[in-house]
């Protein structure tokens, strides 16, 4: 359902928004575009609401349309499992008053609602879901602490501070007997100081020695930072590709003159964007990348999904990381399957879901004793020297 706000679509804009959609055995782009109002809900059908900017006016809208398409593909796959869904969608752009959408009688009938995208729309939607006993899944970055006080909220987004702490914990657990080597990349735009300073502080507290060197150091001084007896774990203080490229060249020179030296790298989520360029280097230097998602283009399941997306919507997914259609698919499968199996008792905690995500794992913990649930899924993507990739979940 597209809300009656001041927002107006421009001539030529294309939307694929059902109002509402009842999943069917056959599913294509035309079914979305021309969907008619759903029939009376079956007793076992879950009512799902989407309140996001679903338009073709700007990047936010295009990304959310892609998320929504993946969501609908999940509903179609669930149909084959005997799980019926009635999906209702409201276009809620940045300047919309979400309270207008909430006047629609279909909103209060939902079992769960996914949204909003914008922080200022969160409180009225959260209050509405609390009043009507509806699960509210907030799928993207939102400011504020509504989740601390509202037990109906499921916050998927994790703050930079939280992820930084988890990356440090993972490093300390994975490399207790290694020699960390911090490389200053002379990048004045870097925002990685929170991680490198935090990690150094933790290493100091544990009495673990480490070295600091610089990309501009001579080969001799650069080599002095590395251990010949322990595995070295290299940490750059930037996530940018140009500096990574220089660092890899320096490591190539180092290992050419010290062939027995053992080296691993601990990177940043941004490195996942560079795999087409640096994949062989990631294998060579045993790279670990902390992340909350992993888009595996080589996976058969991912390839099948992309082919289906291309067939149904006559276009490819955007090249953003994470892929928004895959995110929507994983979110829908996780929550709808969980709600179908466990009803109101489904909280998304460890062990409550058997769903294996294509890209975006979810695992929730209580945000506070009286609050909602906060996503805690985290992993290391490990590029092994055997040219295999493993994901290590925490």
Go through each PLM region and give its residues:
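Extracytosolic ligand-binding ectodomains
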Residues: 1-394
